[in-house]
Amino acid sequence: MRLILFNRNAFLLACMFVSSVYANAVLDAYAVENPYITITLTSLLAPLSMLAFLKTPRNSAFALGFFVGALLFYWCALSFRYSDFTYLLPLIIVLVALVYGVLFYLLLYFENPYFRLLSFLGSSFIHPFGFDWLVPDSFFSYSVFRVDKLSLGLIFLACIFLSAQNLKKYRMIGVLLLLGALDFHFFKISDLKEVGNIELVSTRTPQDLKFDSNYLNNIENNILKEIKLAQSKQKTLIVFPETAYPIALENSPFKTQLEDLSDKIAILIGTLRAQGYSLYNSSFLFSKKSVQIADKVILAPFGEIMPLPEFLQKPLEKLFFGESAYLYRNAPHFSDFTLDDFTFRPLICYEGTSKPAYSSSPSKVFILMSNNAWFSPSIEPTLQRTLLKYYARRYDKIILHSANFSTSYILSPSLLGDILFRKRS
């Protein structure tokens, strides 16, 4: 009996499932900025994820999930390069893949196409250990199709009919279903004037130097340099990435310098905040010598929090996060910042790709700060932007993103209109 993990057909189906993500990763790697190339490729490849999901036989379901988990989320293990547990990197990739193998086995347990339709649409609600980056809906972020559940259901039905044995009989139905899922506002470009005078900083701070105290002076000088450059451009707000200032800012003399500079330009910066024995991943907004603070609400599973029962959580926190009494804590709710008449919601990395951040917010504009150096080089920045674009379109939001070790950008709620700021060398 052939080992199911080495089923070649399952691997090819997994490649079909993730093809739109990898195609966009290649475009990002070669800095291809023509949006019509991205839209054409995504519109053709994203439905293949549905076709792979539909056609995988039950005895290959586990293998499909295993390969999808490895192909989409191998980068989760790359952060171990900066720990004392580098040797665990291959094991982490395999463990992640096994989790998604089990998940897909359950999702594809029945081969009935309408069961597969419901399980595909429901898969984005299933978050193993709180990790919510498997959102197949987001594969359509840069496609000509709408990204709501109804439209995705129509596309899946079209896949059912167009892949039927009696194609001639069902071809017209399939085509009509695809037409029904089209976004007929394809050529609409959203007005981004509200955020046109904001400077998004892309930094290149290596992860192995970021928390080195000997490198702090260099980080401070680069921050001051970027602020002065933004002032010369007459920008009203400058945005730095997550933990751009990598130590607790509140008790640092550098805070006074930022307060003084905020007389002429507002400064939004990612940093850390200590309160008692709790550590918060925070964003500070300096304006007119005053400061607003928002702490991260949704912590990254296994990176900032152990999503496990307490009897496992405590020893693993001690093992991976060290003997320090300081542990990451989260804020109880999201906060919005107000800058004159401009209101926006600040988000920090992982929480920016989570549905709760968008579904309950009256804010039109979201500003996200990320440190992607943990996972560079990998497909993580592409997958992140795919998810962010999905939420921008799904909830009609404008998302600004300032990142370390990846591209900074402004995402439009319409299909067209994104503005990318390529990372500096």
Swiss-Prot record:
The active site is at residues 242, 296, 349. One of its GO terms (cellular component) is plasma membrane. Disulfide bonds: none annotated. Coiled coil: none annotated. GO terms for molecular function: N-acyltransferase activity. It holds the Pfam family CN_hydrolase. The chain crosses the membrane at residues 10-30, 34-54, 60-80, 88-108, 120-140, 144-164. Its EC number is 2.3.1.269. One of its GO terms (biological process) is lipoprotein biosynthetic process. Keywords: Acyltransferase, Cell inner membrane, Cell membrane, Membrane, Transferase, Transmembrane, Transmembrane helix. It is a multi-pass membrane protein. It is found in: Cell inner membrane. It is an enzyme of class 2 (transferase). Residues 201-425 form the CN hydrolase domain. Pathway: Protein modification; lipoprotein biosynthesis (N-acyl transfer). Signal peptide: none annotated. Catalyzes the phospholipid dependent N-acylation of the N-terminal cysteine of apolipoprotein, the last step in lipoprotein maturation. Belongs to the CN hydrolase family. Apolipoprotein N-acyltransferase subfamily. NCBIfam families: lnt, PRK12291.1. This is Apolipoprotein N-acyltransferase. It comes from Helicobacter pylori (strain J99 / ATCC 700824). The gene is lnt.
